[in-house]
Curated annotation (Swiss-Prot):
The gene is tsr2. This is Pre-rRNA-processing protein TSR2 homolog. The keyword Phosphoprotein does not apply. May be involved in 20S pre-rRNA processing. GO terms for biological process: maturation of SSU-rRNA from tricistronic rRNA transcript (SSU-rRNA, 5.8S rRNA, LSU-rRNA). Pfam families: WGG. Residues 118-133 have a biased composition (Polar residues). It comes from Danio rerio (Zebrafish). Residues 134-146 have a biased composition (Acidic residues). The keyword rRNA processing applies. One of its GO terms (cellular component) is nucleus. Residues 118-181 are annotated as: Disordered.
Length: 181
């Protein structure tokens, strides 16, 4: 495999950037600071690291690229990708690299344009917090207080809430919280 020319390398770098910037997992990791204060810089560094990985290694297979990206996400963003998107991202980057190697830069630029349009039209992915069972209990208690109404009802509800949690200390120093029925 011959090394990529500088113009081809630039196109491939743009392609990698476009793929990673439209990948919801990385967007969420950056937006929520999974990589710390420098999450955005780490995402930009990933583009260079991935491009360098292709430059340094010949004839990469999608599963090797997938492993590399997975390792980067785990090390830099403390994120394990298990949504099924990682093989797609790896396949997309590998395909664009092959097109660059074959000199089909116009096709790669067209794909970059489509990805950039997708990025601007769809916006950024958002992480929504999952409601835990404990949150459900809190909502039920609030609803009970709302349904009771009046000051007497509120005092009954708050007493019931306090009675829900009974603490007892065991011999080993742990405090066990149990619900009364």
């Amino acid at each position: 495999m011959a090394p990529l020319s500088s113009s081809t390398r630039e196109v491939f770098s743009e392609a990698v950037r476009a793929v990673l910037e439209t990948w919801p997992v990385l967007q969420i990791a950056v937006d929520n600071g999974f990589g710390g204060a420098f999450s955005q810089q780490k995402a930009e560094w990933m583009v260079d690291a991935l491009q360098q990985y292709f430059t340094d290694n010949g004839d990469l297979q999608p599963d090797e690229v997938e492993d590399f990206i997975s390792e980067l996400m785990n090390n830099e963003f403390d994120t394990v990708v298990d949504d099924g998107s990682l093989p797609q991202v790896a396949q997309q980057v590998c395909g664009m690299f092959q097109q660059c190697e074959q000199g089909r830069l116009a096709e790669v630029r067209e794909q970059i344009l489509k990805l950039n349009q997708k990025k601007t039209s769809s916006g950024r992915a958002k992480a929504t917090p999952a409601q835990t069972p404990q949150d459900d209990d809190d909502d039920d208690e609030e609803e009970a207080m709302d349904c009771e109404g009046g000051s007497a009802g509120a005092s009954v509800s708050s007493t019931a809430v306090n009675d829900l949690h009974h603490e007892e200390e065991e011999d080993d120093g742990w405090t066990v919280v149990r619900r009364k029925k």
